Amino acid sequence: MAALGSSSQNVTEYVVRVPKNTAKRYNIMAFNAADKVNFATWNQARLERDLSNKKIYQEEEMPESGAGSEFNRKLREEARRKKYGIVLKEFRPEDQPWLLRVNGKSGRKFKGIKKGGVTENTAYYIFTQCADGAFEAFPVQNWYNFTPLARHRTLTAEEAEEEWERRNKVLNHFSIMQQRRLKDQDQDEDEEEKEKRSRKKPSELRIHDLEDDLEMSSDASDASGEEGSRASKAKKKAPVTKAGRKKKKKKGSDDEAFEDSDDGDFEGQEVDYMSDGSSSSPDEAEGKPKVPQQEDGPKGVDEQSESSEESEEEKPPEEDKEEEEEKKAPTPQEKKRRKDSSDDSDSSEESDIDSETSSALFMAKKKTPPKRERKPSGGSSKGTSRPGTPSAEAASTSSTLRAAASKLEQGKRTSETPAAKRLRMDTGPQSLSGKSTPSSGDVQVTEDAVRRYLTRKPMTTKDLLKKFQTKKTGLSSEQTVNVLAQILKRLNPERKMIGDKMHFSLKE
């Protein structure tokens, strides 16, 4: 208790007076300690309001009456603000920042920004001691934080944008140089890898892409594609060629006794001649379409190409036999025919083809006179009906020779033979679409199909091979690749690199 009494004796009491009505308003100026502000060094100080934002709060001055005025503009403007909830802030000079200049123009500058919300939940007072020892407390109205202003000149918006662009250029330049260095390093590494590969043994396993194989096969097909296909097809069709040779021997034996033969000697061998697909009948030469047999199966693209190649291989021995027979018994009609064919061959390639077909037809008529007998009996098909009585034209070989020679002289044969060729080419797909049509899912690798796919959109070789699958075409993968390579060479499509892959396309 004594301690408490002694402590209470040491307490000093002060009188604090709070004035009710004060004309003065007190504000606090807060400086950052890092700015190292020393009031003792201040010889001169000037404080003023920054009223530069007054233009922002100002409204456009419009005349209320007279020229350029609007009727009830203020009312309509207020209605618009209420509609959109726009609240205008009044320009209050008390809320504007302070500008403090110390020691004239050469001194420092500070800008004091009002700190809001300081006096909302707290009350600050400034105590001043009077002469009688009492304190007067004055409430703080506002709080301002003063920060020093930069002395150097700042950039405008346009200048800052220009500097930013220059900075981007500099950074881009550095990045470009860095990319070049990286590229050079990559090239050096690639060269080193190539040298290492060249030093390695050549007997290494190499995996090729399907597109590379197709391009390689298309390049090699010029020299060895046809020979390889002929060799493989000759192996497959070995029994067929043997049968063809037997038929040729039979024909040769028949031709030897042709001069002494009578009208009915060839009736037993008619079926052999009618079943022969390589020789062209007079019905085809005269333009009548050939009715397919029911026994014939559906022919694919490879079978058609094989039959055409076999017919090309069979042509030279037939021509040799024709030359031997012409040497034995040359007639004036044949001499005239030879002259016409030689003139046509000198004129153009088409006339060569026409003369060859006409000579082949001519010799076919010479060899098989009973075929003329089948025309009046209505046996245009390869059917089994026997011929009726022989016509007057088939009485002797001289009549057929004269008729053929007269047709050659008139020039009808030259116009009919290309039509017969077209009929033979056209009847092939017709026979496929007729009795011996393949199933609806079968697909043939044709030039029209490839052209149709390439005109739609650019495709790679993989896409084309997917379109022509082995299950649908009936061909092996090697045959499909070879056929596609030949078709692409003929079409010669445009080549584009899309995503590191070669794409082929055609324009309509």
From Swiss-Prot:
One of its GO terms (biological process) is response to virus. The modification Phosphoserine is found at S217, S218, S221, S224, S377, S380, S381, S385, S391, S431, S433, S436, S440. This is General transcription factor IIF subunit 1. Residues 232-251, 364-374 have a biased composition (Basic residues). Residues 177-448 are annotated as: Disordered. Heterodimer of an alpha and a beta subunit. Interacts with GTF2F2, CTDP1, TAF6/TAFII80 and URI1. Interacts with GTF2B (via C-terminus and preferentially via acetylated form); this interaction prevents binding of GTF2B to GTF2F2. It is found in: Nucleus. Phosphorylated on Ser and other residues by TAF1 and casein kinase II-like kinases. The keyword Transmembrane helix does not apply. It comes from Rattus norvegicus.
